[in-house]
Amino acid sequence: MLAAAQEGSEVAFSRLWRDGNPALLRYLRVIAPEAAEDVAADTWLQVVRGLAGFRGTEQGWRAWLFTTARRRAIDEARRRSRRPEKALEETLPSRLPVSPDTADLALEHVDTRSALSLVASLPAHQAEVILLRVVAGLDNETVARLLGRSPGAVRVAAHRGLRRLAGILAEADVTL
């Protein structure tokens, strides 16, 4: 599939997008909540531009996708810190579109939203490690390279983050 997308197959690229975008958005909603969709769009634009030159495996491609997203999120955070925020009323449309299945979709994703919310409450480095390991499905060594840390530091951050999540859930007597 990756090779076909690199050769210009729209069907193959569409499949890469369908397979990768949900996890990418879940990751970005935690590390860049105010701009997740914008950062995802920038990420995919960068992927389109660089896909033909990418050399590696499917797992390497996932790592490249999330590395690109992380860099775009950092760029967006810098950009936002330099410009004043618009008033909320200016950014919202006057009427939000409603889909007949919106309620069903909301119910379907309630557990995912709760879990992501809990992960977002962790220290940033622990949350990012957990998201890259669990949501993105990357291995320890890949996450370590992506974040510029040692595999041991990644394991420790994941362990501490998961232990903290377990404590939060035990205190609240919550099941996801």
Residue ranges and their predicted role:
Residues 1-4, 114-123:
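Short amphipathic alpha-helical boundary/capping segments
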Residues 6-15, 25-42, 55, 176:
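Short, charged helix-capping/linker segments at alpha-helix termini
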Residues 70, 74, 126, 135, ...:
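DNA-recognition helix of helix-turn-helix
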Residues 30, 49-56, 66-88, 108:
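Arg/Lys-rich amphipathic alpha helix in sigma70-family domain 2
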Residues 38-45, 59-71:
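Structural recognition of an alpha-helix C-terminal capping motif at a helix-to-coil junction
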Residues 16-34, 50, 119, 171:
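Amphipathic, Lys/Arg- and hydrophobic-enriched alpha-helical face
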Residues 23, 114-117, 127-128:
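Pre-recognition alpha-helix immediately N-terminal to the DNA-recognition helix
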